[in-house]
Curated annotation (Swiss-Prot):
Biological process, per Gene Ontology: translation
Pfam families referenced in this protein's UniProt entry, alphabetically: Ribosomal_L4
Protein name per UniProt: Large ribosomal subunit protein uL4
InterPro entries: Ribosomal_uL4 (IPR002136), Ribosomal_uL4-like (IPR013005), Ribosomal_uL4_dom_sf (IPR023574)
Record has rRNA-binding as a keyword: yes
Segments of this protein annotated with the region Disordered: 59-113
GO CC, any one term: ribosome
Gene3D superfamilies noted in UniProt: 3.40.1370.10
UniProt function note: One of the primary rRNA binding proteins, this protein initially binds near the 5'-end of the 23S rRNA. It is important during the early stages of 50S assembly. It makes multiple contacts with different domains of the 23S rRNA in the assembled 50S subunit and ribosome. Forms part of the polypeptide exit tunnel.
Subunit composition and interactions: Part of the 50S ribosomal subunit.
Signal peptide: none
Family in the record: Belongs to the universal ribosomal protein uL4 family.
Length: 230
């Protein structure tokens, strides 16, 4: 029994194979998507937790209200203590007065939540696996051929890949042509490989990788890039 279970544990899922597409519907070879990234079981609760934390961290948290001690004015007693028949008052900046301070109002705070890196990575892999199972991940050799940006070319190419509306385009930071080509396209979000996150994957209908960006995401930065960053 132990030998059988050990054999099953050592068995690995086969990598997914996708065609590398070019404009006009042509294919330029294939590329493998590692099963440990693009074919894992999606944990919905984990993805929800990670996305919630990401959106919370994006909040500015600069909201603020003034208490009666912070509102300008109100130093003088509005009327005498006794003899008026009215309730005694010490300041016109008390909460019950118009223009007075706020009680228990919002104050600046940090909404960020601590999320372990392993959880963030697992949630991202689950989101990518969900898109891969539904044929919503595409790999292209380059979004626009040449060095001249073209919004029209990029738009037509994305329309060939899918008839769905929202695209997450993962391209290398050095691919200026691709960044400029999709900058003005509605419902198309360009992103660098090291910025890929669970929320953006789930918020898009299709994820499009350039070959360069896919390699950078799967294998990490190259040695040359690491030397430049030092």
């Amino acid at each position: 029994m132990s030998a059988v279970s050990t054999q099953k544990d050592t068995e690995k899922k086969a990598n997914l194979v996708l065609p590398v597409k070019e404009a006009g519907g042509k294919s330029n070879g294939t590329v493998e998507l590692p099963a440990e990234i693009f074919d894992v079981t999606a944990n919905i609760a984990l993805m929800h937790q990670v996305v919630t934390a990401q959106l919370a961290a994006a909040r500015q948290g600069t909201h603020a209200t003034k208490t009666r001690g912070e509102v300008s004015g109100g130093g003088k007693k509005p009327y005498r203590q006794k003899g008026t028949g009215r309730a005694r008052q010490g300041s016109t900046r008390a909460p019950q007065f118009t223009g007075g301070g706020t009680v228990h109002g919002p104050q600046p705070r940090d909404y960020s939540q601590r999320t372990p890196k392993k959880m963030i990575r697992a949630a991202l892999h689950g989101a990518l696996s969900d898109r891969a199972r539904n044929d919503r991940i595409h790999v292209v050799s380059e979004l626009v051929a040449g060095q001249t940006p073209s919004t029209k070319t990029a738009k037509n190419f994305l329309a060939e890949l899918s008839d769905r509306k929202k695209f997450l385009v993962v391209v290398g930071r050095e691919d200026v042509t691709a960044w400029k080509s999709v900058a003005n396209l509605q419902n198309v979000q360009p992103i660098a490989p090291d910025q890929l996150n669970t929320y953006d994957v789930l918020n898009s209908d299709d994820v499009v990788f350039s070959v360069e960006a896919l390699n950078a995401f799967v294998h990490g930065p190259t040695e040359a890039a690491q030397e430049e960053s030092k």
